[in-house]
Amino acid sequence: MPTPHDIFAQMPPAVVEQLFSFLEQKEKPLYMTTIDTLAKQRKLRTIFVARKPRAERNVWLREVVAKNINEGIAAHLLQIWLVGAHAKLLCDFLDGLGIAHDENGTIETLPPAPSKDALLKAIEPLFTTHDPAVVAVYLHAFQALDDQGWPSLAELLAEDPRLQLAAA
Protein backbone atom coordinates (compact mmCIF):
# COMPACT_ATOMS: atom_id res chain seq x y z
CA MET A 1 0.00 0.00 0.00
CA PRO A 2 1.53 3.34 -1.00
CA THR A 3 2.23 5.79 1.79
CA PRO A 4 1.59 9.53 1.36
CA HIS A 5 5.13 10.22 0.18
CA ASP A 6 4.81 7.32 -2.30
CA ILE A 7 1.58 8.86 -3.60
CA PHE A 8 3.46 12.10 -4.33
CA ALA A 9 6.19 10.15 -6.12
CA GLN A 10 3.67 8.26 -8.26
CA MET A 11 0.89 10.75 -8.97
CA PRO A 12 0.64 12.19 -12.49
CA PRO A 13 2.44 15.52 -13.01
CA ALA A 14 -0.83 17.28 -13.93
CA VAL A 15 -2.31 16.32 -10.56
CA VAL A 16 0.84 17.46 -8.75
CA GLU A 17 0.51 20.80 -10.55
CA GLN A 18 -3.17 21.04 -9.49
CA LEU A 19 -2.24 20.33 -5.89
CA PHE A 20 0.56 22.88 -5.63
CA SER A 21 -1.39 25.51 -7.59
CA PHE A 22 -4.29 25.13 -5.16
CA LEU A 23 -1.97 25.46 -2.18
CA GLU A 24 -0.21 28.48 -3.67
CA GLN A 25 -3.49 30.27 -4.45
CA LYS A 26 -5.79 29.20 -1.59
CA GLU A 27 -3.41 28.18 1.21
CA LYS A 28 -0.53 30.63 0.67
CA PRO A 29 0.79 30.56 4.29
CA LEU A 30 0.92 26.74 4.23
CA TYR A 31 2.55 26.77 0.79
CA MET A 32 5.26 29.22 1.91
CA THR A 33 5.82 27.37 5.20
CA THR A 34 6.22 24.14 3.26
CA ILE A 35 8.80 25.75 0.98
CA ASP A 36 10.62 27.19 4.00
CA THR A 37 10.65 23.88 5.90
CA LEU A 38 11.79 21.83 2.92
CA ALA A 39 14.41 24.36 1.83
CA LYS A 40 15.95 24.41 5.32
CA GLN A 41 15.87 20.63 5.43
CA ARG A 42 17.88 20.58 2.20
CA LYS A 43 20.17 23.36 3.50
CA LEU A 44 18.92 25.87 0.92
CA ARG A 45 17.85 29.44 1.38
CA THR A 46 14.07 29.76 1.19
CA ILE A 47 14.29 32.68 -1.22
CA PHE A 48 16.29 30.50 -3.63
CA VAL A 49 13.39 28.05 -3.89
CA ALA A 50 10.62 30.66 -3.73
CA ARG A 51 12.06 32.61 -6.67
CA LYS A 52 12.23 29.63 -9.01
CA PRO A 53 9.68 29.68 -11.83
CA ARG A 54 6.44 28.04 -10.65
CA ALA A 55 6.80 24.90 -12.79
CA GLU A 56 10.40 24.36 -11.68
CA ARG A 57 9.52 25.07 -8.03
CA ASN A 58 6.65 22.57 -8.13
CA VAL A 59 8.86 19.86 -9.63
CA TRP A 60 11.37 20.50 -6.83
CA LEU A 61 8.62 20.41 -4.19
CA ARG A 62 7.30 17.12 -5.52
CA GLU A 63 10.76 15.52 -5.53
CA VAL A 64 11.41 16.58 -1.94
CA VAL A 65 7.93 15.77 -0.57
CA ALA A 66 8.20 12.33 -2.19
CA LYS A 67 11.09 11.41 0.13
CA ASN A 68 10.41 9.11 3.08
CA ILE A 69 11.60 11.74 5.57
CA ASN A 70 8.69 13.97 4.53
CA GLU A 71 5.90 11.47 5.18
CA GLY A 72 4.09 13.80 7.58
CA ILE A 73 4.32 16.77 5.22
CA ALA A 74 3.05 14.65 2.33
CA ALA A 75 0.07 13.43 4.37
CA HIS A 76 -0.79 16.96 5.51
CA LEU A 77 -0.59 18.45 2.00
CA LEU A 78 -2.78 15.68 0.57
CA GLN A 79 -5.38 16.19 3.30
CA ILE A 80 -5.49 19.98 2.89
CA TRP A 81 -5.75 19.73 -0.91
CA LEU A 82 -8.37 16.99 -0.97
CA VAL A 83 -10.59 18.62 1.66
CA GLY A 84 -10.08 22.12 0.27
CA ALA A 85 -10.28 21.47 -3.46
CA HIS A 86 -12.16 18.18 -3.75
CA ALA A 87 -14.69 18.04 -0.90
CA LYS A 88 -17.41 17.10 -3.40
CA LEU A 89 -15.43 14.00 -4.43
CA LEU A 90 -14.95 13.01 -0.80
CA CYS A 91 -18.66 13.49 -0.06
CA ASP A 92 -19.74 11.60 -3.20
CA PHE A 93 -17.55 8.62 -2.25
CA LEU A 94 -18.76 8.49 1.34
CA ASP A 95 -22.39 9.04 0.30
CA GLY A 96 -22.05 6.14 -2.14
CA LEU A 97 -21.09 3.95 0.80
CA GLY A 98 -23.71 5.39 3.15
CA ILE A 99 -21.05 6.73 5.54
CA ALA A 100 -21.95 9.81 7.58
CA HIS A 101 -19.53 12.73 7.17
CA ASP A 102 -19.28 16.48 7.65
CA GLU A 103 -19.78 19.04 4.86
CA ASN A 104 -16.14 18.64 3.81
CA GLY A 105 -16.32 14.87 3.43
CA THR A 106 -14.31 14.08 6.54
CA ILE A 107 -15.08 11.40 9.12
CA GLU A 108 -13.88 10.94 12.69
CA THR A 109 -13.37 7.17 12.67
CA LEU A 110 -13.10 4.75 9.81
CA PRO A 111 -16.04 2.32 9.80
CA PRO A 112 -15.56 -1.38 9.07
CA ALA A 113 -14.54 -2.22 5.53
CA PRO A 114 -17.38 -2.40 3.02
CA SER A 115 -17.57 -5.26 0.55
CA LYS A 116 -15.69 -5.04 -2.71
CA ASP A 117 -19.01 -4.84 -4.58
CA ALA A 118 -20.18 -1.92 -2.42
CA LEU A 119 -16.90 -0.13 -3.09
CA LEU A 120 -17.23 -0.67 -6.84
CA LYS A 121 -20.76 0.76 -6.77
CA ALA A 122 -19.53 3.83 -4.88
CA ILE A 123 -16.40 4.35 -7.01
CA GLU A 124 -17.83 3.82 -10.50
CA PRO A 125 -19.90 7.05 -10.61
CA LEU A 126 -16.90 9.08 -9.42
CA PHE A 127 -15.19 8.54 -12.78
CA THR A 128 -17.99 10.32 -14.64
CA THR A 129 -18.22 13.38 -12.37
CA HIS A 130 -14.59 13.88 -11.26
CA ASP A 131 -11.11 13.83 -12.79
CA PRO A 132 -10.17 10.11 -12.86
CA ALA A 133 -6.57 10.87 -11.86
CA VAL A 134 -7.79 12.79 -8.80
CA VAL A 135 -10.16 9.92 -7.95
CA ALA A 136 -7.19 7.54 -7.97
CA VAL A 137 -5.09 9.86 -5.79
CA TYR A 138 -7.98 10.32 -3.35
CA LEU A 139 -8.63 6.60 -2.96
CA HIS A 140 -4.93 5.86 -2.42
CA ALA A 141 -4.75 8.69 0.13
CA PHE A 142 -7.94 7.46 1.83
CA GLN A 143 -6.36 4.03 2.17
CA ALA A 144 -2.94 5.36 3.25
CA LEU A 145 -4.10 7.88 5.83
CA ASP A 146 -5.55 5.23 8.15
CA ASP A 147 -3.26 2.76 9.89
CA GLN A 148 -5.37 -0.23 8.91
CA GLY A 149 -7.19 0.82 5.75
CA TRP A 150 -9.72 -1.45 4.13
CA PRO A 151 -8.52 -4.77 2.66
CA SER A 152 -11.32 -4.63 0.06
CA LEU A 153 -10.15 -1.18 -1.10
CA ALA A 154 -6.53 -2.36 -1.15
CA GLU A 155 -7.58 -5.15 -3.52
CA LEU A 156 -9.39 -2.73 -5.84
CA LEU A 157 -6.47 -0.31 -5.87
CA ALA A 158 -4.17 -3.15 -6.92
CA GLU A 159 -6.54 -4.66 -9.51
CA ASP A 160 -8.30 -1.78 -11.27
CA PRO A 161 -6.05 -0.12 -13.89
CA ARG A 162 -8.05 3.13 -13.58
CA LEU A 163 -6.87 3.42 -9.99
CA GLN A 164 -3.16 3.13 -10.70
CA LEU A 165 -0.91 6.09 -9.89
CA ALA A 166 1.42 5.80 -12.86
CA ALA A 167 3.35 9.06 -13.04
CA ALA A 168 4.05 9.97 -16.62
Protein language model regions, located:
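Short intrinsically disordered terminal tails
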Residues: M1-P2, G98-H101, R162-A168
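Charged, amphipathic alpha-helical stretches
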Residues: P2-T37
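Long alpha-helical solenoid repeat scaffolds
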Residues: T3-I7, A14-E17, F48, L89, ...
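Acidic, low-complexity, intrinsically disordered interaction modules
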Residues: Q25-S152
